[in-house]
């Protein structure tokens, strides 16, 4: 279950990252998931962000680009690019976890 309120610093980080992503990719959804969405984060937690788009031709190349975008924002960001068609496959356990526990930010 998603946490009711998220730390304002995390929201600001996610929003800055969202704006950077939108400069390069046509985004369907951006979802914060993992420990920050569940409220179970600790000082070593990364900031898991699912990025759903049809623009990801080469998922590994996109991952490298998305990781590069984190450098000037926050090193804890862990981007997870997902093709829209894969995100619509709710039988995928990873996608199911994002849908059930994630918080949509775009």
Question: Positions of the model-derived regions?
Answer:
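Glycine-rich beta-strand-to-loop/alpha-helix junction loops that act as flexible
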Residues: 33-35
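Short hydrophobic/aromatic beta-strand micro-patches
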Residues: 50-52
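Short, conserved active-site loops that position catalytic residues or coordinate cofactors/metal ions
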Residues: 45-47
């Amino acid at each position: 279950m998603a946490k009711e309120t998220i730390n304002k610093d995390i929201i600001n980080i996610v929003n800055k990252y969202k704006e950077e992503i939108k400069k390069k990719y046509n985004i369907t959804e951006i979802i914060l998931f993992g420990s920050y969405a569940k409220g179970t984060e600790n000082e070593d937690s990364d900031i898991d962000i699912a990025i759903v788009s049809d623009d990801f031709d080469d998922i590994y190349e996109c991952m490298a680009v998305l990781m590069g975008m984190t450098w000037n924002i926050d090193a804890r960001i862990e981007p997870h690019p997902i093709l829209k068609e894969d995100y619509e496959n709710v039988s995928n356990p990873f996608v199911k976890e994002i849908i059930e526990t994630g918080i949509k930010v775009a």
